[in-house]
Amino acid sequence: LTLSEAGAKVVVLERGPWYTVRQFTHDEVGICRRDFFVPYPYAGYDPKTIRKKGEKKAHRTTEGWIGVCVGGGTVHMSGFFYRFKESDLRLKSMTGGLKDADLADWPIAMDDLLPYYDLMEARVGVSGQAGINPFETRKRPFPLPPLKTHPAAKLLDQAAGSLGFHSFPTPRAITSRSYGKRPPCNYCGYCGDYGCENGSKSSTLASLIPAAEATGRCQIKPDCMARRVLVDKDDRVRGVEYIDSRGEVQKIEARVVVLAASAIESARLLLLSKTGRFPQGLGNRSGLLGKNLTFSTFGKATAIFDRGELEAKLGKGGMDLP
């Protein structure tokens, strides 16, 4: 969006389909047991494997999946929109360095990031309440007021308070009221793992891509999988080789190539882009490409409440309590 607004001609290659809002339903079997957003890991044609140590045998897993569609993982995200803390940028300094850990301090400070956090939250539409998180790094209010509190979350808040903990509503990339052309959340309860049929979740599909297309300088090419980055005789990046929707190999020239395929897929693409100067993968002189990757991690828990008030049909997903 930023590049196209600045006057650059942009082509976006996406290996998955381009879904519309009408295709997002509450099909739990389709989401959890079929390959609506990602190729099913046990189907054989795109397996995901993991191993705890390099010498161990890899095994298939369903964990760590990302959306293979226009908008990527933001389409099926829960919409939690936390910011980094200052300590996240200074791990090496704070820990003094740990044995066998490749920690490094960021070359920028939180004050350098704050304007861009503010800009992104305003662009996509984030709901929240400023000033209640004692660890937050913000100087401005959220673009939108907080979402309604789920009855189960109120019980958790009470329990947390009785134990001396300070709970607070989670900032969500979900519109609590009308925002631009997008409607407010209808509290259907299907956020995490699902696409939003209401257009209220602030995925890039709902928020940024329409604006980028409106510039007339951004072209989205779905079902086109990048295969390697192309370089010239001087090892300068000159474009991308990709497989189109018909299974044919195509090439596209570009002055600038931006990799935005998640931590694993971006690293894999660079490893596949070997050259005479970079035999271990493009830009991989150190041999560290694909190592020390940073991911979006999360935890989850399940609880059963025997309380009548929880039968109220108000929710933002069973596991998506603020």
Describe each region flagged by the PLM.
Residues 2:
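Rossmann-fold NAD(P)-dependent oxidoreductase module
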Residues 6-8, 15-83, 110-119, 154-161:
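N-terminal FAD cofactor-binding segment of flavoenzymes
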Residues 52-54, 58-66, 70-73, 77, ...:
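FAD cofactor-binding and catalytic pocket of flavoenzymes
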Residues 36, 49-62, 93-226:
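Conserved redox-cofactor binding core of oxidoreductases
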Residues 182-185, 231-238:
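A short, glycine/Asx- and small/polar-enriched loop/turn
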Residues 21-25, 73, 78-80, 88-89, ...:
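Short, solvent-exposed loop/turn and secondary-structure capping segments
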